[in-house]
Amino acid sequence: MLRIADKTFDSHLFTGTGKFASSQLMVEAIRASGSQLVTLAMKRVDLRQHNDAILEPLIAAGVTLLPNTSGAKTAEEAIFAAHLAREALGTNWLKLEIHPDARWLLPDPIETLKAAETLVQQGFVVLPYCGADPVLCKRLEEVGCAAVMPLGAPIGSNQGLETRAMLEIIIQQATVPVVVDAGIGVPSHAAQALEMGADAVLVNTAIAVADDPVNMAKAFRLAVEAGLLARQSGPGSRSHFAHATSPLAGFLEASA
């Protein structure tokens, strides 16, 4: 069971809504993933009506919506988008995204921290997308963010956990949930994130652009479950030396 702020989730896999070939395929994949928290870019939906092609099926699916501020380049733009989302969707939950460079889509740490502090004070449950910077993640936690969402690699790159060393530090020091966001390309990446201690992963591109998004969503669901179970089972420690699983010494001595 995963708890973030006032909500609990059985699934440790969060999903996105972008890049799917159709809204129907998007919903089928989300259902197959078992995800209970789904991100939604405000720039992609018509907030004036709940029968929007993306919004309506998500509401019908009964998932928790996590509007994001993707497209915002400054703290001010993100705060403005956050208030639009709260008014339209009736939720205080927000994935804070500020990335001024359209080529790399890397989060702006200064603007993100600035916006996070303001939004928390205004009553939002803030989940910030950020670089895998342990110092920044701690600062975001200190200003009241409900979770932190450090990247594994650039958005949509499918490179996996390129920031693993920094993610391990973030996980070790965090007192709020850590959700690895961006760059996860195959189910094994998700399993590794859960094994190393992440509380959840957010996956969008890897599912949406797969030849079979529904089955890929199932694969991610199973990978996250496997990674979590492996961590909870207490894996053995690593060693530089070999350790025989079936020592022969006693057997040979007895047979001499």
Swiss-Prot record:
One of its GO terms (cellular component) is cytoplasm. It comes from the Bacteria. One of its GO terms (molecular function) is thiazole synthase activity. InterPro entries: Aldolase_TIM, Thiazole_synthase_ThiG, ThiG. Pathway: Cofactor biosynthesis; thiamine diphosphate biosynthesis. It is found in: Cytoplasm. Keywords: Cytoplasm, Schiff base, Thiamine biosynthesis, Transferase. The active site is at K95. Homotetramer. Forms heterodimers with either ThiH or ThiS. PANTHER family: THIAZOLE SYNTHASE. HAMAP family: ThiG. This is Thiazole synthase. It comes from Escherichia coli O8 (strain IAI1). The gene is thiG.
